Every structure is written in C-alpha cells, then in structure tokens.
Amino acid sequence: MASFIEKLLATAIKSDRSYLILVSGQQGIGKTSFAIHATFTAYLNYAKVLRHLYFEADDFFKDTASMTKSLPVAVFDDAGVWLSRQRWYEKETVYLGNLLQLSRNLFKLVIFTTPSENLPKQIVTHLNYVIRALSVEERGNMTAGVIYKKSYTHAFENSYGRVEGVIRWPRRYPDDVYEAYSIIRSVKVAKFKAIAAVASGFKEEAKKAIEAVRESIDLERLRELIVKLGGDEDDIKVIEERVIATLKYFYS
C-alpha cells in the first residue's frame, strides 16, 4: 500500500496535480485504516493525520480558507453519510465539488471512505482511483482490495474503470490513534444523529443526546493523545475547536 501512495504523491508533486481516491467496502472492513495508513505515509505523524481527517465540509472549508500552500493528503471519512448523492443540491456539496476542481492547490491526494459509494456526481466525476476493499485476511490483521483506475466521467454505472492491481494494507493502527479517532468520531456521529432527530420532530431528544455526549467527552484526554502522537499546539487547537464547535451545535 505504501508504495502505491508514495508513487501517487511523487507523481502529483512532480506534475503539480492532485489525485482523488475513493475507498469503498462494507462496514468494518478497513476503509478508515487505509486512509490513516496512507496519510501517515505522507505526514509521518499521527496527529497530522487526525488533523487532516474530515467528517464534514465545514471543517475542511475552515482549514483550506487560510492555506497558503498545498499539503500532501486530506481524508473525507464516512463521506457517504455527509456527502450523500441525495444531497447534491446542498450548498456545502456544491461548494466542495467546486473546490475539488482546485484540489491541486490544496492537497496532493484526497481520499474518500464510504461503504455505500453513494457520492454526488460532482464528486465522482473528479475521482482518479477507486479502491474496493473486498476481504479481511490473516486472522483479521490485513485487508485486501482491488485498485481501479477511473476511465470515464460519469457517475457509477456498471464498471469502475480499468483494473490496476491488487492492494493489501494493515487493518489496525496504534491504540492511541484509535482512541483519539474514536473521541472525534463519536462527537460527529452524535451531531448527525441529532440532525436526524430534529428533522423527525424530536428536537428536545436531540438536545439531550448532544448534552450526554458533551458530558462524556474527555477533552483533556484528547489533548494528551494528540501530544503523545506528535501534535503541536496548533494541531491541538484545531482538533479541539472542531470537537467543541460540534458539541455547541444546538447552543449557538
């Protein structure tokens, strides 16, 4: 896996372009593991990996607004949830689709993970590679998949494009990374659940759920983990602000 990512990064830097990669497969098969290992290949720092892993468009927009140079990798995790094809008309999706046309000025590699492959056309048409995670091997320690090179500019139909080869990667990553990732993800999941509850007419229940998550989140522990993983003050600030902003969703 590392050689595939390293070659793409080298080509992207040399040719001043970017590559967009979709990683698909059933839940728990190792899509996020691919993204984390791939991003670590570029940054060699797990705190930087977590900083450049996005669960919603607003965090990405905030980061890229102040960027003055392109960075190696960004990850849109669980993209099928917050970038669903059914949301193609929403302004965040439209803006992101437009911004991805300028992705070479932002990130050299952009990785999307999703079980459903249900991304809007303005995202799909910019993809360069699709990696389908197919099986778990070696007693759950490795994931195997197939790399497809996109050869058309339409939404998913009957083919992913040309088969480039088979790829394998570790399904696990360090425990501290998993713990920090789980804290961040739990807050984002709570927000999406609350939004669904509000849309169904259960606003008070949604507030209570968010409050419960707020009380359970250990920000001090998250800070400790980011430092332990090699993060600097700016990494801590950015990641912590994302979590706090999400927890304040119903209190702004």
Segment roles from a protein language model:
Residues 1-15:
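Pre-Walker A adenine-sensing motif
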Residues 15-22:
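Pre-Walker A (Motif I) flank of P-loop NTPase domains
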Residues 26-27:
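The conserved Walker
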Residues 31:
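Conserved lysine of the Walker
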Residues 40-53:
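Post-Walker A helix-loop "phosphate-sensing" segment adjacent to the P-loop in P-loop NTPases
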Residues 60-109:
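Conserved nucleotide-sensing/catalytic segment adjacent to the nucleotide-binding pocket
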Residues 122-139:
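A short helix-turn-beta junction within AAA+ P-loop NTPase domains corresponding to the substrate/partner-engaging
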Residues 129-131, 142-252:
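Conserved P-loop NTPase motor module
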